[in-house]
Design a protein with these regions (language model features):
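Conserved nucleotide-sensing/catalytic segment adjacent to the nucleotide-binding pocket
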Residues: 35-41, 45-106
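C-terminal accessory "lid"/substrate-recognition subdomains
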Residues: 113-124, 143, 155-156, 160-290
């Protein structure tokens, strides 16, 4: 059977926003539907490795500026768009890996954590591409995406997550983290938030506890202490005949807040995604074949 195109699904959102929950949900869908997907991490399309980035940040600071991983200057948007375009019509393309830890370097002799592997051609017979990272919905990339999903907590929760992650995993002081948040705010406004107006479906986690001052919060609100607001484009609801009343009945404790929005308990986020997205993925795979 000849392919017409290879579907591309992109999850866009900051690290710690819940994109890992989304990836797990998609892995469940792929397994059940017997779909083979190539997974692309957004980190692999940063322009600089960890060591080069530190040098570039210092160079920008000396000039009175700031460079962050949110910005176009620190990423390979055109290369990512080229991968999506090529894969969409051929099932192939160039990819590489970003090595986060010592464990990940074991397969790559001579490379250290924070470095990239060499570029390589995607090998294997895949049905679709799944992207998870910061920039799946930037204007250069979005035209090639068949299903764009945003995962974004409210901003105070995102800051709490970043502060706790950077303190515990990276050893940064709260003061240093707050300065980084302030310094990259322009890039967040310019490059991150516009993507969520392009998404087909948004998942936004909202804590049900006081997060009014995220810089002194002692704990990250748990899923049990949160609700998830799921907003779907009206075009998506119509195209895939999504029944919000059915979803409300399937997901205990949920309610419809607008004609295109359902609110579910935090622990139900993964299940909600599987119920909503599975028929969309089935349709994308079915219509990709001639």
């Amino acid at each position: 059977m000849r392919r017409k195109k290879y579907p591309i699904v992109a999850i866009t959102g900051s690290s710690g926003a819940g994109t890992s929950t989304v990836k797990t949900a998609f892995e469940h869908i792929m397994l059940r539907e017997n779909i083979k997907a190539v997974f692309i991490e957004g980190d692999s399309f940063h322009k600089y490795d960890r060591f080069e980035m530190k040098k570039k940040v210092n160079e920008y600071k000396k000039k009175g500026g700031y460079l962050s991983h949110y910005s176009k200057e620190a990423n390979l948007f055109e290369d990512l768009a080229e991968l999506f375009k090529t894969f969409k019509f051929t099932g192939k393309g160039k990819r590489r890996y970003y090595l986060h830890s010592e464990e990940e370097t074991e397969k790559w002799e001579g490379l250290k954590p924070g470095q990239f592997t060499p570029w390589e051609e995607i090998s294997g017979d895949y049905d679709m591409l799944f992207y998870e990272g910061l920039h799946g919905g930037v204007e250069e990339v979005a035209p090639y995406v068949d299903l764009l999903i945003g995962v974004v907590p409210i901003i105070n929760l995102e800051w709490i997550q970043k502060i706790h992650r950077d303190r515990t995993a990276r050893g940064y002081s709260t003061e240093a983290i707050v300065q980084a948040i302030k310094a990259r705010m322009d890039d967040y406004v310019d490059y991150i938030t516009p993507q969520f107006s392009r998404t087909d479906i948004n998942f936004q986690r909202v804590p049900m506890v006081d997060t009014s001052n995220p810089f002194i919060a002692r704990d990250v609100p748990t899923a049990d202490e949160s609700l998830v607001v799921i907003r779907m484009k009206k075009e998506i609801i119509k195209k895939y005949d999504i029944d919000l009343t059915y979803l409300k009945n399937m997901l205990e404790g949920s309610f419809i807040s607008r004609r295109n929005t359902i609110v579910v308990p935090g622990p139900k986020m993964g299940l909600a995604m599987e119920i909503i997205v599975t028929p969309i993925i089935q349709h994308l795979i079915k219509t990709s074949e001639l």
